[in-house]
Amino acid sequence: MNYMDYDAETLFSVGRRFLNGDCVEKDVVKAKAMLGRAAELGHPLARKLLATIEENSPETADEMAEWNKMRSGEMYDWTDPVIDSSLRRSRLACEKFNRSGIDHDDYRHLLQEMVPGVADSVTILPPFHCDHGNGLHLGEGVFVNYNGMFLDAGDITIGAHTLIGPNCSLYTPQHPMDFRQRRKSLESALPITIGEDCWLGGNVTVCPGVTIGDRCVIGAGSVVTHDIPSDSLAAGNPCRVIRKLN
Protein backbone atom coordinates (compact mmCIF):
# COMPACT_ATOMS: atom_id res chain seq x y z
CA MET A 1 0.00 0.00 0.00
CA ASN A 2 1.31 3.46 -0.91
CA TYR A 3 1.83 5.54 2.23
CA MET A 4 -0.13 8.38 0.57
CA ASP A 5 -3.23 6.16 0.65
CA TYR A 6 -3.31 6.14 4.47
CA ASP A 7 -6.02 7.97 6.42
CA ALA A 8 -5.51 11.56 7.59
CA GLU A 9 -4.53 10.73 11.18
CA THR A 10 -1.93 8.16 10.12
CA LEU A 11 -0.49 10.52 7.52
CA PHE A 12 -0.23 13.27 10.12
CA SER A 13 1.46 10.99 12.66
CA VAL A 14 3.98 9.49 10.24
CA GLY A 15 4.59 12.82 8.53
CA ARG A 16 5.46 14.40 11.87
CA ARG A 17 7.92 11.57 12.53
CA PHE A 18 9.62 12.17 9.20
CA LEU A 19 9.77 15.88 10.05
CA ASN A 20 11.34 15.36 13.47
CA GLY A 21 13.40 12.27 12.68
CA ASP A 22 11.57 10.23 15.35
CA CYS A 23 12.08 6.48 14.75
CA VAL A 24 12.60 7.13 11.03
CA GLU A 25 15.21 9.02 9.01
CA LYS A 26 14.44 12.73 8.86
CA ASP A 27 13.00 13.65 5.47
CA VAL A 28 11.39 17.09 5.18
CA VAL A 29 10.24 16.53 1.61
CA LYS A 30 8.41 13.32 2.49
CA ALA A 31 7.04 14.96 5.65
CA LYS A 32 5.57 17.84 3.65
CA ALA A 33 4.06 15.46 1.11
CA MET A 34 2.37 13.42 3.85
CA LEU A 35 1.22 16.44 5.85
CA GLY A 36 -0.08 18.03 2.66
CA ARG A 37 -2.11 14.93 1.91
CA ALA A 38 -3.42 14.86 5.51
CA ALA A 39 -4.42 18.52 5.16
CA GLU A 40 -6.25 17.72 1.92
CA LEU A 41 -8.19 15.07 3.83
CA GLY A 42 -9.24 17.68 6.39
CA HIS A 43 -6.78 17.17 9.27
CA PRO A 44 -6.72 20.58 11.06
CA LEU A 45 -3.38 20.10 12.83
CA ALA A 46 -1.74 19.03 9.58
CA ARG A 47 -2.72 22.36 8.02
CA LYS A 48 -1.21 24.29 10.94
CA LEU A 49 2.00 22.27 10.99
CA LEU A 50 2.38 22.56 7.23
CA ALA A 51 1.92 26.34 7.45
CA THR A 52 4.63 26.50 10.12
CA ILE A 53 7.02 24.51 7.94
CA GLU A 54 6.33 26.80 4.97
CA GLU A 55 6.99 29.90 7.08
CA ASN A 56 10.11 28.71 8.86
CA SER A 57 11.66 26.17 6.51
CA PRO A 58 11.47 27.26 2.89
CA GLU A 59 12.06 24.47 0.41
CA THR A 60 15.71 24.03 -0.38
CA ALA A 61 17.09 23.86 -3.88
CA ASP A 62 17.59 20.12 -3.42
CA GLU A 63 13.94 19.58 -2.46
CA MET A 64 12.71 21.50 -5.50
CA ALA A 65 15.30 20.10 -7.91
CA GLU A 66 12.99 17.72 -9.78
CA TRP A 67 10.17 20.27 -9.88
CA ASN A 68 12.51 22.89 -11.34
CA LYS A 69 13.76 20.39 -13.91
CA MET A 70 10.17 19.65 -14.88
CA ARG A 71 9.35 23.32 -15.42
CA SER A 72 12.58 24.02 -17.33
CA GLY A 73 12.28 21.20 -19.87
CA GLU A 74 14.96 18.93 -18.38
CA MET A 75 14.59 15.22 -17.68
CA TYR A 76 12.98 14.73 -14.27
CA ASP A 77 11.66 11.98 -11.99
CA TRP A 78 7.88 12.20 -12.03
CA THR A 79 7.64 10.13 -8.80
CA ASP A 80 9.45 12.87 -6.85
CA PRO A 81 7.54 13.65 -3.59
CA VAL A 82 7.05 17.35 -4.37
CA ILE A 83 5.66 16.54 -7.82
CA ASP A 84 3.57 13.68 -6.44
CA SER A 85 2.04 15.95 -3.80
CA SER A 86 1.10 18.50 -6.47
CA LEU A 87 -0.43 15.80 -8.67
CA ARG A 88 -2.55 14.54 -5.80
CA ARG A 89 -3.73 18.02 -4.85
CA SER A 90 -4.72 18.67 -8.45
CA ARG A 91 -6.59 15.36 -8.77
CA LEU A 92 -8.67 16.19 -5.72
CA ALA A 93 -9.38 19.71 -7.01
CA CYS A 94 -10.43 18.31 -10.40
CA GLU A 95 -12.69 15.73 -8.75
CA LYS A 96 -14.46 18.42 -6.71
CA PHE A 97 -14.83 20.68 -9.75
CA ASN A 98 -16.16 17.90 -11.95
CA ARG A 99 -18.73 16.81 -9.37
CA SER A 100 -20.10 20.33 -8.94
CA GLY A 101 -21.17 21.29 -12.47
CA ILE A 102 -21.10 24.80 -13.94
CA ASP A 103 -24.41 25.82 -12.31
CA HIS A 104 -23.12 25.08 -8.81
CA ASP A 105 -22.93 28.09 -6.48
CA ASP A 106 -19.26 27.36 -5.79
CA TYR A 107 -18.29 26.97 -9.47
CA ARG A 108 -16.01 30.00 -9.53
CA HIS A 109 -14.38 29.10 -6.20
CA LEU A 110 -13.78 25.50 -7.30
CA LEU A 111 -12.35 26.70 -10.61
CA GLN A 112 -9.92 28.95 -8.71
CA GLU A 113 -8.94 26.03 -6.52
CA MET A 114 -8.24 23.90 -9.58
CA VAL A 115 -6.52 26.64 -11.65
CA PRO A 116 -5.05 29.19 -9.21
CA GLY A 117 -5.30 32.80 -10.36
CA VAL A 118 -7.62 32.11 -13.30
CA ALA A 119 -9.55 35.19 -14.48
CA ASP A 120 -13.26 35.51 -13.71
CA SER A 121 -13.97 35.78 -17.44
CA VAL A 122 -12.58 32.29 -18.12
CA THR A 123 -15.07 29.44 -18.56
CA ILE A 124 -14.15 25.76 -18.28
CA LEU A 125 -16.93 23.21 -18.68
CA PRO A 126 -16.65 20.03 -16.61
CA PRO A 127 -15.41 17.40 -16.84
CA PHE A 128 -11.89 18.79 -17.02
CA HIS A 129 -8.55 17.30 -16.04
CA CYS A 130 -5.11 18.83 -15.47
CA ASP A 131 -1.91 17.61 -13.82
CA HIS A 132 -1.05 20.55 -11.58
CA GLY A 133 -3.27 23.53 -12.42
CA ASN A 134 -0.59 26.09 -11.56
CA GLY A 135 1.01 25.51 -14.96
CA LEU A 136 -2.08 26.82 -16.77
CA HIS A 137 -1.99 30.47 -17.84
CA LEU A 138 -5.33 31.39 -19.41
CA GLY A 139 -6.06 34.83 -20.84
CA GLU A 140 -9.26 36.84 -20.49
CA GLY A 141 -12.35 35.26 -22.01
CA VAL A 142 -10.81 31.84 -22.71
CA PHE A 143 -13.47 29.16 -23.17
CA VAL A 144 -12.75 25.45 -22.73
CA ASN A 145 -15.52 23.05 -23.76
CA TYR A 146 -16.32 19.67 -22.22
CA ASN A 147 -13.69 17.05 -21.44
CA GLY A 148 -10.52 19.10 -21.71
CA MET A 149 -7.30 17.25 -20.84
CA PHE A 150 -4.47 19.71 -20.10
CA LEU A 151 -1.31 17.98 -18.83
CA ASP A 152 0.64 20.93 -17.48
CA ALA A 153 3.95 19.47 -16.32
CA GLY A 154 5.29 22.23 -18.56
CA ASP A 155 3.55 25.59 -18.84
CA ILE A 156 0.42 25.85 -20.98
CA THR A 157 -0.35 29.41 -22.07
CA ILE A 158 -3.59 30.25 -23.89
CA GLY A 159 -4.17 33.79 -25.14
CA ALA A 160 -7.25 35.93 -24.58
CA HIS A 161 -10.57 35.05 -26.24
CA THR A 162 -9.38 31.68 -27.52
CA LEU A 163 -11.98 28.92 -27.84
CA ILE A 164 -11.07 25.29 -27.12
CA GLY A 165 -13.51 22.69 -28.48
CA PRO A 166 -14.71 19.55 -26.69
CA ASN A 167 -12.37 16.62 -26.06
CA CYS A 168 -9.21 18.64 -26.72
CA SER A 169 -5.94 17.39 -25.25
CA LEU A 170 -2.85 19.50 -24.58
CA TYR A 171 0.18 17.38 -23.65
CA THR A 172 3.39 18.95 -22.34
CA PRO A 173 5.05 15.80 -20.84
CA GLN A 174 6.81 13.26 -23.01
CA HIS A 175 8.44 9.95 -22.15
CA PRO A 176 11.97 9.18 -23.39
CA MET A 177 12.50 6.86 -26.34
CA ASP A 178 15.02 4.81 -24.32
CA PHE A 179 13.09 2.15 -22.36
CA ARG A 180 15.80 2.12 -19.68
CA GLN A 181 15.03 5.74 -18.85
CA ARG A 182 11.29 5.03 -18.85
CA ARG A 183 11.87 2.27 -16.28
CA LYS A 184 13.51 4.88 -14.03
CA SER A 185 10.33 7.03 -14.09
CA LEU A 186 12.07 9.73 -16.11
CA GLU A 187 10.33 12.10 -18.49
CA SER A 188 10.57 15.69 -19.73
CA ALA A 189 8.05 18.42 -20.47
CA LEU A 190 7.96 21.16 -23.09
CA PRO A 191 5.64 24.19 -22.91
CA ILE A 192 2.62 24.73 -25.15
CA THR A 193 1.60 28.22 -26.26
CA ILE A 194 -1.66 29.06 -28.03
CA GLY A 195 -2.16 32.67 -29.11
CA GLU A 196 -5.10 35.04 -28.82
CA ASP A 197 -8.41 34.68 -30.67
CA CYS A 198 -7.75 31.11 -31.76
CA TRP A 199 -10.35 28.39 -32.26
CA LEU A 200 -9.49 24.73 -31.80
CA GLY A 201 -12.19 22.37 -33.05
CA GLY A 202 -13.24 19.24 -31.20
CA ASN A 203 -10.81 16.39 -30.54
CA VAL A 204 -7.68 18.41 -31.29
CA THR A 205 -4.44 17.13 -29.76
CA VAL A 206 -1.54 19.54 -29.22
CA CYS A 207 1.84 17.88 -28.63
CA PRO A 208 4.73 18.99 -26.38
CA GLY A 209 6.62 22.13 -27.35
CA VAL A 210 4.10 23.41 -29.92
CA THR A 211 3.30 27.09 -30.44
CA ILE A 212 0.11 28.09 -32.27
CA GLY A 213 0.07 31.74 -33.32
CA ASP A 214 -2.69 34.31 -32.89
CA ARG A 215 -6.03 34.04 -34.72
CA CYS A 216 -5.50 30.46 -35.90
CA VAL A 217 -8.26 27.97 -36.61
CA ILE A 218 -7.35 24.30 -36.07
CA GLY A 219 -9.68 21.76 -37.68
CA ALA A 220 -11.46 19.10 -35.65
CA GLY A 221 -9.49 15.92 -35.03
CA SER A 222 -6.12 17.49 -35.82
CA VAL A 223 -2.88 16.36 -34.17
CA VAL A 224 -0.62 19.40 -33.91
CA THR A 225 3.00 18.25 -33.83
CA HIS A 226 4.72 21.42 -35.12
CA ASP A 227 4.32 25.18 -34.75
CA ILE A 228 1.50 26.89 -36.64
CA PRO A 229 2.06 30.53 -37.70
CA SER A 230 -0.47 33.25 -36.89
CA ASP A 231 -3.57 33.71 -39.06
CA SER A 232 -3.54 30.14 -40.34
CA LEU A 233 -6.27 27.62 -41.06
CA ALA A 234 -4.66 24.26 -40.31
CA ALA A 235 -5.91 20.69 -40.05
CA GLY A 236 -4.93 17.05 -40.33
CA ASN A 237 -2.78 14.39 -38.71
CA PRO A 238 -0.14 15.66 -38.63
CA CYS A 239 -1.65 19.16 -38.71
CA ARG A 240 -0.61 21.27 -41.71
CA VAL A 241 -1.42 24.81 -42.80
CA ILE A 242 -4.16 24.83 -45.45
CA ARG A 243 -4.26 28.55 -46.10
CA LYS A 244 -3.79 31.98 -44.55
CA LEU A 245 -6.86 33.58 -43.01
CA ASN A 246 -5.88 37.24 -43.47
Give names to the regions the model predicted.
Residues 5, 12, 32-33, 48:
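TPR/TPR-like alpha-solenoid signature
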Residues 128-139, 143-212, 232, 237-246:
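Flexible, glycine/small-residue-enriched loop-and-beta-strand segment within the central core
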Residues 10-20, 52-54:
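Hydrophobic face of amphipathic alpha-helices that form TPR/SEL1-like repeat modules
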Residues 44-59, 236:
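TPR/TPR-like alpha-solenoid helical repeat scaffolds
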Residues 31, 36-38, 57-121, 239-243:
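Terminal amphipathic alpha-helical/low-complexity segments used for targeting or macromolecular assembly
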Residues 4, 22-26, 40:
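Short coil/turn and helix-start
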